[in-house]
Design a protein with these regions (language model features):
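Extracytoplasmic/lumenal domain signature
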Residues: 30-36, 70-73
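N-terminus-biased targeting/localization segments
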Residues: 1, 7-10, 20-22, 30-32
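Conserved N-terminal structural module of periplasmic/extracytoplasmic solute-binding proteins
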Residues: 10, 48-52, 58-63, 72, ...
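Repeated polar recognition positions within modular binding domains
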Residues: 6, 23-25, 63
Length: 245
């Protein structure tokens, strides 16, 4: 049974069951035909997020990613490259809103593969693989815009992706079409320097990128805020790079 009287996230599985986040008590998998409990994941633990990709369940709790086989309920033991990649991005594992999802999963093009999307783009991963492949660069489109939040996404039979987003005060659906003839990164690069992280500059870069898709906008930030670099240090590095051409 569900311990709490409310939930902040639930989703259907390919098996026809329903996954419900039970606040403070993990995830409950329910048979909707009779309301019975199929199994429980991470019992007694606060889970911040759930997502499915085919027969796989993914959860985030305490900034760590966990994967499970929905057929057996057992943990996935061959996703180390995936967990390392996702956990390295604080925006993917720190949830600060319920109006959108910083991270979402999707069934892959093979039984043992999956796609996931975040603010940096769309990625493909094959279970057991040592690398995570980026197939859409978020810096070249609206995915990287600070005012864009993903709420849903899917893929059609031709392999095209459709992403529903909260974009400021609007709801938009973006489509991304893969073309083998389109370079992954434009040949022309424009570097924009910002002493500190700035959302206005990021939004401006996204708008420029959309208007001029043949130019890659590279934003460099002098001070990340995560280290002891001062503004003087950052400007010295910038001047050195400018003098070096």
């Amino acid at each position: 049974s569900i311990q709490s009287s409310y939930t902040f996230q639930a989703c259907f599985t390919e098996n026809g069951t329903v996954l419900i986040v039970d606040p403070g008590n993990g995830v409950a998998e329910i048979n909707p035909s009779d309301g019975s409990l199929v199994r429980r994941y991470e019992e007694g633990i606060r889970v911040d997020f759930i997502g499915t990709a085919g027969k796989m369940l993914f959860t985030i709790q305490d900034q760590t990613l966990h994967g499970y086989d929905l057929d057996t309920g057992k943990p996935l033991d061959n996703i180390s490259a995936l967990t390392e990649q996702i956990q390295s991005d604080e925006q993917d594992v720190n949830w600060t809103t319920t109006s959108s999802f910083p991270l979402m999963f999707l069934k892959g093009d093979e039984d043992n593969s999956l796609f996931y999307i975040d603010h940096t783009g769309v990625y493909r991963y094959v279970l057991g693989g040592s690398t995570v492949e980026q197939i859409i660069d978020g810096s070249l489109n609206s995915l990287s815009s600070p005012d864009t939040g993903t709420v849903a996404w899917g893929q059609d039979s031709d392999g095209n992706f459709y992403v529903g987003c909260n974009a400021g005060e609007d709801i938009k659906i973006y489509s991304y079409v893969y073309s083998k003839d389109t370079p992954t990164t434009p040949d022309t690069e424009l570097t924009v320097y910002s002493l500190k992280d700035n959302d206005f500059i990021k939004q401006a870069a996204v708008l420029f990128q959309k208007k001029y898709p043949d130019v890659y906008v590279n934003i460099e930030t002098g001070m990340s805020g995560d280290d002891s670099v001062t503004d003087t240090d950052a400007l010295k590095v910038l001047n050195t790079e400018i003098m070096a051409g």
